[in-house]
């Protein structure tokens, strides 16, 4: 009886696809089944802000059974969610929800954060080392199909092991490799896990 508006922050469902242009690719958009089920099973929630799936909701979903408003931004800070609620007698009588595009290259850096980033860049510089090579074009990831970066990783595995076939999971590719000089930092951004490469012999049948 002391709450005027109940807002729930959720983090469930399938993780967002590891693909740089995922928000522009309907093929990899994650379903909201778990969020919808939760909002239908728990009455009294005015606003549910979802996460984890990175499924941007441009217009709020109104749950048909409970009236809960459901929204979510895309991932990686590409949008800023803005919610305006008009409340009368503890009821949301109007709402306006927007996903605002964030153009990070147009924003000045925060001085304190920039200083800390610069400090840690100096700390890890010896581990990064000099450039290892160059990319003549950006090597991108795709989540549901073959990609240039995925092909490169698989080719490295084959070269290292002498295997006939190599397989890597798309979810383990966490960043594209940019055009230009590539150092160990770029490699760790793209493939940050301490995975073991394992060779097995399989029957052809």
Task: Give the predicted meaning of each segment.
Residues 6-11, 45-56, 71-73:
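Active-site neighborhood of phospho(di)ester-bond hydrolases with catalytic His/Asp-centered motifs
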Residues 23-27, 56-57, 69:
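Second-shell residues forming the walls of enzyme active-site clefts
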Residues 2-6, 43-46, 66-68, 162-164:
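Loop/turn elements at helix/coil->beta-strand transitions in domains of secreted/extracellular proteins
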Residues 55, 77, 174:
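Residue-level detector of flexible, active-site-proximal loop/helix-junction positions
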Residues 15-18, 30, 37-41, 47, ...:
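Solvent-exposed loop/linker segments at secondary-structure transitions
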Residues 1, 75, 99-102:
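Surface-exposed loop and adjacent secondary-structure segments within mature catalytic domains
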Residues 1-23:
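Short acidic, glycine-rich surface-loop motifs adjacent to enzyme active sites
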Residues 65, 70-72, 76-79, 85:
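Phosphate/diphosphate-binding loops
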């Amino acid at each position: 009886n002391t709450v005027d508006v109940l807002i729930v922050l959720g983090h469930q469902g399938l993780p967002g696809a590891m693909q740089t242009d995922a928000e522009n690719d309907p093929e990899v958009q994650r379903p909201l089944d778990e969020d919808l089920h939760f909002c239908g099973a728990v009455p009294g929630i005015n606003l549910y802000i979802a996460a984890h799936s990175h499924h941007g909701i441009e217009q709020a979903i109104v749950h048909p059974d409970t009236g809960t408003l459901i929204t979510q931004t895309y991932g990686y800070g590409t949008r800023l969610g803005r919610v305006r609620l008009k409340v009368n007698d503890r009821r949301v009588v109007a709402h306006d929800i927007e996903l605002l595009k964030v153009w990070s290259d147009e924003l000045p850096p925060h001085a304190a954060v920039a200083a800390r980033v610069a400090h840690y860049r100096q700390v890890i510089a010896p581990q990064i080392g000099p450039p290892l090579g160059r990319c003549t074009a950006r090597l991108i990831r795709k989540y549901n199909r073959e990609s240039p970066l995925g092909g490169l990783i698989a080719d490295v595995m084959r070269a290292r092991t002498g295997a006939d076939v190599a397989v890597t999971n798309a979810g383990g590719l966490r960043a594209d490799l940019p055009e230009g000089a590539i150092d160990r930092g770029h490699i760790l951004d793209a493939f940050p896990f301490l995975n073991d490469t394992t060779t097995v012999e399989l029957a052809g049948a």
